[in-house]
Amino acid sequence: MTTDATRSEQIRQTVDRNFRLSVHSSFLDPYLPKALHNFTALKHPRLKFKVFAHLFRHLKLKPLSEELSQHPYCDFLDLSPQQWSTFKNLLGALYFLDEVKTTIGYFKKKLLLELISEKGYDFALHRGNLYAPILKTIAIPPLNGELEQRIHAVGKFLTEYLWTQQPEPLIQRFVLKFNNKSTWNFQHVIDPHLQQQLFNICRHLLKETEVF
C-alpha cells in the first residue's frame, strides 16, 4: 500500500512531466505561474467551468481518480503534451486579458489606438462580433515599453488563433496602422484540428472576462 508521501511524489512528478513536455515555448511562459494560480484559486469560477466543459468535450479528457483530484493542480494532470501546451497558452491569454482590461484606459488617453475605420469597428462591436475587441487590442502600436509590447503580443496571440475561423475573416475588412506603417502578416499557427476548440474556448475567455 502506497504511503501519502509516495502519492504526493507521484503527483509532483506528473505535474513536472507536463511542464517539461510543453514543447512550444512562448512569450507567455514567464507569466504562467500567476495564470495557474488565478485559475486554480477560482478567480473566475464561471470561466473555469466553461473552459473545462470545452476541454472535456473537445479534448476527450478522462476523469481523474479521487486520489489525484485532491491535488491543487489536479485539473492539469491528464493533459497530453499537445493539450497541455495549448491549455498553457490559453491560461496565459486569460492573464493578459486581465492586463488589457486594466490598462486600456491608459492607451486611450495617450491616443495610441489607431484604426483606419473607427466606424467599421463600432459596427462590428455593436453586432456582437468577438473579433472587434481583438482588433482594437492589436491596433496598439508596439512601443518600447515592456507593458505596451506585452499588450500588443496578446492581441497577436489571440488573433492568430481566432482569425482563421470564418470563411471571410473580419480582419480582412480592416487596415491596421503601426509605427512602421506596415500591415500585419497573419499565418496559420496551430494544428487545423485544434482551431475550432480553441475558438470556442477563447470565445468564452472574451465573454466572461468582459474585456472592454
Roles of regions detected by a PLM:
Residues 1-212:
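General marker for long, soluble alpha-helical cores
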